[in-house]
Amino acid sequence: MKFLFDLFPIILFFAAFKVWGIFTATAVAIVATLAQVAWVAFRHRKVDTMLWVSLGVIVVFGGATLVLHDEKFIQWKPTVLYWLFAIGLLAARYAFGNNLIEKMMGKQLTLPHPVWDKLNVAWALFFAVLGVANLYVVHNFTESQWVNFKLFGTTGAMVVFIILQSLWLTKYLKDE
């Protein structure tokens, strides 16, 4: 259910784009992300840093898209967000000694610390590659194809990555 909730702004962006175009879709994505943050704050009294970063990036890049009437800003937004996530994961681990992947998943999984470090680096690399892939699609495909990639391509890549990660982790999980 959380996965669908996380996709909420992207799905609304996609639907609005198909009906009204990129600028209305951008406004819808901003409002949907604001609503998402408000709901999480109301419901849980705490909003994850990643969601705050997502909100900041959509407001800045979406706002620039609307004010300057230039779709390139919203098209760059996923790349900036993915690269911020990658940098955040690596900086937290290697500059501050905090493995954010372990903090997020440590209650569900018991893994040796070197495995957590590999997982952290794998996620950082995954986000870095997603950022590059987004730029490639932005500069080599149509706006409509980019919107399809944004929903289906990145979501599909995420699902495949999680499945591969799960398969890799099975050799480290203890029988319970």
UniProtKB/Swiss-Prot annotation:
User: InterPro entries, alphabetically?
Assistant: YciB (IPR006008)
Q: Which UniProt keywords apply?
A: Cell inner membrane, Cell membrane, Membrane, Transmembrane, Transmembrane helix
Mind telling me which GO cellular component terms the entry cites?
A: plasma membrane
List where in the cell it is found: Cell inner membrane
TM regions (residue ranges)? 3-23, 24-44, 49-69, 81-101, 121-141, 149-169
What topology does it adopt in the membrane?
Multi-pass membrane protein
Pfam families referenced in this protein's UniProt entry, alphabetically: IspA
The family note in this entry says:
Belongs to the YciB family.
The record's function comment reads:
Plays a role in cell envelope biogenesis, maintenance of cell envelope integrity and membrane homeostasis.
- What is the name of this protein? Inner membrane-spanning protein YciB
The encoding gene is yciB
